[in-house]
Amino acid sequence: MKCLSCDGETFETLDYINRDFPNTGIFDELIIRICSNCGFSFLATDPTSDQIDNFYTSDYRKKGSAYHLDFGKIGRLKNLDPRAFAQLATGISFVDFKPFDAFLDLGPGNGNSFAMANLLLPNPRLYGVELNSGAIDFYHANYNANCFENLEKIISEGKLFKVILLSHSLEHIRKDDLIYFISQIRKIISEDGICIIEVPNDDFRKKELHARSNDSPHLLFFSAEALRKLFTRSGFEVIYLKVLGNPRFYNKPNFGPIEKNIVQKVKAAVLYSGILKKFLKNLRRRFLHRVSGFIEINPKGFTDNLLHQFTVDDSRDCIRMIIRSSK
């Protein structure tokens, strides 16, 4: 057995932790294999494709799940989504997105990426890949976004996209399907387009990251090194790669030049935009009484959660990468 990312042949193992889905029967007693060379990690034995399909159809979004969404009750996003905002604000630094170019989210979730695309991109045509009929109706009604069942359907219609977003979706792919999935992305990205990828920072070569509370329903785990190597050898050029996001351990915020430029613009918008002032006021009212997670309001009225999305530090909880097809 060789590592899909680097061809390494030396692996360590780690017990899989299933806190969120103990009654599904597919995430119990699993073992994670960790490539000692690059940090790419995967399950020693994958659930079958049918098991995964049934899980996402029946269990992932059901009531009581940590990932439950009732699309009949949630509404159109009225404020900012810090993660989606940061992903797209960074991505547009690397692409010339023209009016009516196409944006695709591979796993839109609550649809907030569509709201941020409408905010940051000029008249984008919005698309998603989604199976849930309630979600499909919600995206179309609130954001005029159209959905495909899968990548094969997109390829058959010959559609290309200027910006593709793969936010916290790649880790849900089966190892046996990973290389094929990446090859499909190459077929739908436009010649001058980009793909924005974000995954959890799970470099399990670092023993301190073994102290975690849950792995389910993730099937893959990435280090920044592994993510770069995986897509480089698959025919992509990596044009941006940073570890950022919420802190696992406290460190003073550190912004690179790209992130610093975006943060300065956002701060200026906060000072001069009535919409963002209202957004921050609403956040203060909602979260000031909470002391949980990493969501808090600093004395200057700027959310730490949004700043975290631009804070570069190897101990942060996410890896953000932007790629384009190699010429």
What role is predicted for each listed range?
Residues 1-167, 176-182, 315-319, 326:
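Conserved N-terminal segment of class I S-adenosyl-L-methionine
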Residues 135, 169, 201-203:
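Active-site-proximal loop/turn and secondary-structure-junction residues that shape catalytic pockets
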Residues 172:
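Phosphate-binding active sites in nucleotide-utilizing proteins
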Residues 12-18, 236-247:
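Conserved S-adenosyl-L-methionine
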Residues 17-27, 245-327:
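A C-terminal cap/extension of S-adenosyl-L-methionine-dependent methyltransferases
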Residues 16, 195-230, 246:
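Short, glycine-/aromatic-enriched active-site segment of Class I SAM-dependent methyltransferases
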Residues 179-194:
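A short glycine-rich, Lys/Arg-flanked "PGG" loop and its adjoining helix->strand segment in the class I
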